[in-house]
């Protein structure tokens, strides 16, 4: 039976195992005193979290039992440090990838009598800058943080106290969401995303399950501030074949709605279809322009696929039609060896008056502020399949056939 939440805070120290299940987690990153372990700010952070009633996991990249630095045995101390460094780095990277939030508190000190320089902190900061799960803070007097400010301040808020930094983190995590086994390695905002869940539920439905997971890349729409695309590297146990496959990436984005707007002729190859011509950066053809059916996606979770299709048809070719005229053809992946998202294809049969009006339309369509600049074309099916990619070829032929 799944637990709904943890009763108290769980602290995991350097090189200790991740918990078997959790609802939320944070990693405390930032400079550590090289010798004066008792002055580490992590102890104060745990006290603050306890007072806040935080009941999730806290990863601390320090040893549970502190061993004083021996100034009289510098060589021995350096050998010990080298021996544990690789294990420490591997543990830290794994936990930072898996956790739901990374707290960077950077009270950097560069005094001769007390060093807390934070060189490793700088590396980790840059490594996880685009993870969309950082919570950053530093005292005003902390030196050498200007560069970190410059590369992050457009995306993240900098807090001036440790308490404020932790408060923002705890508020973001909220009640969390229950995960167990390998799911613990999936950050909360990824696990909860529609893109991931659409893929993951299908795996579970056929008896597959995760044996490993690593997040590789994620893209948040700059204006909407919403997660749009994810690239992750899963290890999957395949129930049908009784084996594990772990050498592929999954590109997950929001599902899409496309519309085949057509005027029917006796010979389906002579039937006329509407195509959108637009420059898209990935294009790789002789004309360096994309020719495709009207379509797109919505970041609004309340939009259904039909509403999205209706909206896209109006935006991209200027045709506003009653939703009752849209007929759903099929729901399929567009490129199943790489991308997990699906396309739902609708078709709309146009009248002679509508198709003739579109033939005369020389205006530019699309949402200009989203950099869309769309020219519409009316082509026969035979002409269209020579212009479009394989995905659109399949959609046109299936839509016309059915």
Residue spans for each PLM region:
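Short glycine/proline-rich, acidic loop/turn segments that cap or connect secondary-structure elements
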Residues: 138-150, 364-378
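N-terminal leader/linker segments that precede catalytic domains of diphosphate-processing enzymes
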Residues: 181-293, 297-311, 318-370, 377, ...
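Conserved catalytic or regulatory cores that recognize and/or transform ribose-phosphate-containing ligands
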Residues: 1-183
């Amino acid at each position: 039976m799944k637990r709904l939440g943890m009763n108290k805070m769980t602290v995991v120290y350097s090189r200790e195992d991740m918990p078997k299940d959790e609802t939320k987690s944070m990693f405390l990153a930032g400079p550590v005193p090289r010798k004066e372990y008792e002055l580490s700010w992590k102890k104060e952070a745990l006290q603050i979290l306890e007072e806040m009633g935080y009941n999730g996991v806290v990863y601390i990249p320090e040893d549970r039992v502190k061993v004083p630095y021996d100034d009289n045995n510098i060589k021995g101390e350096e050998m010990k440090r080298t021996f544990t460094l690789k294990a420490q780095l591997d543990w830290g990277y794994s936990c930072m990838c898996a956790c739901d939030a990374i707290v960077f508190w950077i009270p950097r000190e560069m005094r001769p009598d007390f060093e807390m320089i934070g060189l490793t902190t700088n590396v980790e900061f840059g490594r996880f800058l685009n993870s969309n799960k950082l919570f950053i803070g530093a005292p005003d007097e902390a030196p050498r943080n200007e560069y970190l400010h410059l590369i992050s301040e457009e995306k993240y808020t900098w807090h001036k106290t440790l308490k404020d930094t932790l408060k923002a983190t705890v508020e973001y995590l909220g009640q969390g969401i229950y995960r167990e086994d390998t799911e613990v390695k999936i950050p909360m905002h990824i696990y909860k995303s529609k893109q991931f869940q659409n893929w993951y539920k299908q795996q579970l439905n056929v008896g597959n399950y995760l044996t490993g997971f690593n997040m590789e890349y994620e893209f948040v729409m700059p204006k909407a501030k919403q997660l749009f695309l994810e690239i992750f590297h899963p290890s999957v146990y395949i129930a049908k074949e009784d084996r594990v496959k772990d050498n592929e990436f999954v590109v997950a984005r929001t599902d899409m709605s496309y519309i085949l707007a057509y005027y029917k002729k006796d010979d389906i190859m002579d039937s006329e279809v509407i195509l959108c011509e637009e420059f898209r950066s990935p294009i790789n053809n002789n004309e360096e322009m994309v020719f495709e059916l009207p379509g797109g996606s919505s970041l609004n979770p309340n939009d259904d696929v039909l509403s999205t299709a209706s909206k896209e048809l109006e935006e991209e070719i200027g045709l506003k039609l009653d939703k009752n005229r849209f007929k759903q053809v099929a729901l399929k992946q567009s490129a199943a060896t790489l991308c997990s998202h699906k396309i739902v294809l609708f078709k709309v049969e146009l009248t002679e008056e509508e198709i003739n009006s579109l033939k005369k339309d020389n205006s530019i369509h699309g949402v200009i502020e989203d950099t869309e600049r769309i020219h519409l074309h009316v082509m026969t099916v035979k002409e269209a399949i020579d212009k479009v990619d394989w995905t659109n070829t399949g959609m046109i032929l299936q839509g016309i056939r059915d």
